[in-house]
């Protein structure tokens, strides 16, 4: 069996699963569900870029995969802090002179 057909089928499956995660982001019901769905969409986007890189036969898209992973991690960390504290950046005015 041709590997290109398998790659295209894998791309379609990951794209369809991304649509399911998009529905979870829109519907919710809670903020935690939306955060987990966005994180899963980041991982699925990394998989799509990796499969597309294999399909094209190039290794130069690996930097994009790393950047997507870093941004997904930072986004999840920021949302977790927002859910915990209610704000992302805390200002402590007592330390200023």
UniProtKB/Swiss-Prot annotation:
Keywords: Antiport, Cell membrane, Hydrogen ion transport, Ion transport, Membrane, Sodium, Sodium transport, Transmembrane, Transmembrane helix, Transport. InterPro entries: MrpF/PhaF-like. One of its GO terms (molecular function) is sodium:proton antiporter activity. Disulfide bonds: none annotated. The chain crosses the membrane at residues 3-23, 35-55, 60-80. Its main location: membrane. GO terms for cellular component: plasma membrane. It is found in: Cell membrane. It comes from the Bacteria. It is a multi-pass membrane protein. Pfam families: MrpF_PhaF (PF04066). Mnh complex is a Na(+)/H(+) antiporter involved in Na(+) excretion. PANTHER family: NA(+)/H(+) ANTIPORTER SUBUNIT F1, NA(+)_H(+) ANTIPORTER SUBUNIT F. Belongs to the CPA3 antiporters (TC 2.A.63) subunit F family. May form a heterooligomeric complex that consists of seven subunits: mnhA1, mnhB1, mnhC1, mnhD1, mnhE1, mnhF1 and mnhG1. This is Na(+)/H(+) antiporter subunit F1.
